[in-house]
Amino acid sequence: MNEGAGAREIASLTPMMRQYMEVKALHPDSLLFFRLGDFYEMFFEDAVKASEILQITLTARSKGADKVPMCGVPYHAARRYIGRLVSEGLKVAICEQVEEPGNGPGIVRREVTRVITPGMVLDEEVLEPQASNFLAAVSWNDKGWGAALLEASTGEFMALEAPGIAELAESLSRVEPRELLVPDGKRDAPEVAQLLARLVRTPAVAEGEAASFEPTRAAGYLRSHFAVQSLSAFGLDDAPLAAGAAGAALRYLKDTQKTAAAHVDRLSRQERGGNLLMDESSRANLEVLRSLRDGGRKGSLLGVLDKTVTSLGARKLARWLASPLGSLPEIHARLDAVEELSGRSVWREELAGILKEVGDLERLCGRLSLGAGNARDLRALGLSLAQLPRVVAVLARCESPLLKSLTGPLSALPELAELLSRAVAEEPPVTLKDGGMIRAGFHAELDKLVALSTSGKDLLLQIEQREKERTGISSLKVRYNKVFGYYLEVTKSNLDRVPKDYIRKQTTVNSERFVTPELKEYEEQVLTAEERRCALEIQLFEELRAQVVSAAPRIRSAAEAVATGDALLSFARCAAEYGYTRPEVDASVALSITAGRHPVVERMLGAGDSFVPNDVRLDPAEDAQLMVITGPNMAGKSTVMRQVALTALMAQAGSFVPAKAARIGLCDRIFTRVGAADNLARGQSTFMVEMTETSHILHHATNKSLIILDEIGRGTSTFDGLSIAWAVAEHLHDTVGARALFATHYHELVDLARERPRVKNLCVAVKEQNGKVIFLRKLVPGGASRSYGIEVAKLAGLPPEVVGRARELLQNLESGELDDAGRPRVAVRQPQGGRRGASTGQLGLFGMEPAQGGTGVTPAQQKALDALKGASIDRMTPLDALNLLAKLQRELE
């Protein structure tokens, strides 16, 4: 049966299955977890899909002559299964029993209590502790884009507007959203496809009610939620697209979580100009957050610099690296803090030891505010808040203004910490109905009910023992179920010993069940106490939760302070352990690095290996704006260029850097163009990707930008590639004025330094010794004389006969030997087991042999040869040479 079954088919179902179909109809885009006793069950297509993903057994339930596919998972283990489904980009609707069985006629009432989506995750077991989990809502028109970023588990909420899709993708890529919310009917819109193509990590796509994106309605919804008269405080009065996206995101949170979302207590507008900008491609190429190898943290800059001890700090550090600062005062404030902590090893270790005891304040507060938390969350929150005064005691010793500023938010919650410490049991249960959440001595009435419940159970045990002695039935047991309450169970072999005052209630296969007036009296006493105790505990829990909700803004501020302190501590620990130095960051356009190292590569070297440091100086004011770097492919050009970009990024994030000294003139953007693997799978050729990214750089770079270009033009023919590379370099020098490192295999580009005053040549030094080539990985002034491609091929393990043949062909080509058509000859070898009549001389590159007799040179060819001989090579630029060559080609055609 499919979910569009007709009314007649639905009417033929059992009442429970009809209830399932009614609920499912309200959530057609979600897998429905339907609570039946101790299991969540799934039916029909949901069951088939879930069983495949979760690798659980698919069974069937009878429906007349048909079988309904079904599967299920235990409710106590559901979070793990839900996490796997959500990680596949699916939504899961949780349908719970909202009343106790037997409280009324008919089946138990059930409702969806929340919908879990990739961007709406609250459970600790499903969330990745060190990563944020953002929903991105987007709207657009012919004037631009609006977006809102909402982290449901922490309450973080931002909105922005962007003039185009490239700028929007750049902003979204900083937080790597897990889910994209678009208006109804827009999931397959070309704009959405274009946006997804620009994001390295593709989010799941969901649709929200189109009306919720409408700016006027969304603005009213936001004003109501935040209880304000206007959105001017959030900077959204003049940003209708951003306001529309923000309203839709907030509505999606409330609709899926069935809550008021009180922890979302602030909204900020994200401005593009305040930070160092990087597009998604540049961030990926530099491996800032994850490795290109496997997408993991290991092998990335974040993996090296993350020495945080809290989840809060880990997420903050990732955010700092994804979006470095653009403000000199803020950069210097972080550097001051890192400098102080890096020089205080005792303070560092003391602070790290305390912070390890602090839980995820943001997400604990978020779960409790959304009604998804339990007593264990209260306990964890209380223990974490109790550590904050110890953190304050360490930070109060510091001189850094930034570190001192953290003490205020960390000192604002002593009453809540004390309350939770007194109120919550040391080891509370997972569920609210199990009892034992509240600490003894916190509430007098609860203590009385607990004592009464405990003593009542003792009385029941006494009754059991007394009845055993009175009847002589040693196997007699006092048991309980929800239908009969407490009863005496007697095996059938002992029925002849049952006293006459026993009242029979039920017969089973092996026993009879009885009650007595005394047992019913004590049952009422015990059950009444249990019910009252349970109800009072839940009431007290809700009162404590309300205290947390009211303190949510202060908890969020404390969490921000913990995260900032932990991220600064991580920078300081790296500086001390790795030998980093404080960079000088100023408003100039200089970039000078002395003995710089690649922060990731140096950490991955084997024992006994050491990284070769390099000096780089870019300063347009001193005729050093664009560096053309030549040298063999394995010599380390790409490593040097990447380390320069990473050094600038680290400095503006507030970190010390891997260098003996560094001066970084503030960068507004970092661009890289180094590879096309990510886009090849999307149907673009290597060369098209290369040109698209280069175009983006040339259109958006400024004289404050830092540009890394690696092998521009390699994806096309030699002459086309050289021409494009030359023109790009000229444009960067003459028009853009940006600081740039330009690695190339076109050695002709070294001549740019003779034509352009701010171009300098660097090459990677190579040493030839005993017929072997040693790559020294050291930058030296000047251009490379050759590429050493065959030596690289040898190092890569090509068979010796292939390497030897390549040397022979190279010598032949480099000697300039031409056939009768003026094309280079290639030496021909006798194939193994040679063919009869094979030539042992020279064969043209295209397989042509000279004509029999004569020179084979036509008058036109001779004229071209004479023109070539008469050319003054020393006075020609590469472009002049290319023009001459093109002219000669036309004459020969």
UniProtKB/Swiss-Prot annotation:
HAMAP family: MutS (MF_00096). This is DNA mismatch repair protein MutS. GO terms for cellular component: cytosol. Belongs to the DNA mismatch repair MutS family. ATP binds at G631, P632, N633, M634, A635, G636, K637, S638. Residues 821-858 are annotated as: Disordered. It holds the Pfam family MutS_IV. GO terms for biological process: mismatch repair. Signal peptide: none annotated. Keywords: ATP-binding, DNA damage, DNA repair, DNA-binding, Nucleotide-binding. InterPro entries: DNA_mismatch_repair_MutS, DNA_mismatch_repair_MutS-lik_N, DNA_mismatch_repair_MutS/MSH, DNA_mismatch_repair_MutS_C, DNA_mismatch_repair_MutS_clamp, DNA_mismatch_repair_MutS_core, DNA_mismatch_repair_MutS_N, DNA_mismatch_repair_MutS_sf. GO terms for molecular function: ATP binding; ATP-dependent DNA damage sensor activity; damaged DNA binding; mismatched DNA binding. This protein is involved in the repair of mismatches in DNA. It is possible that it carries out the mismatch recognition step. This protein has a weak ATPase activity. The lineage of its organism: Bacteria, Pseudomonadati, Myxococcota, Myxococcia, Myxococcales.
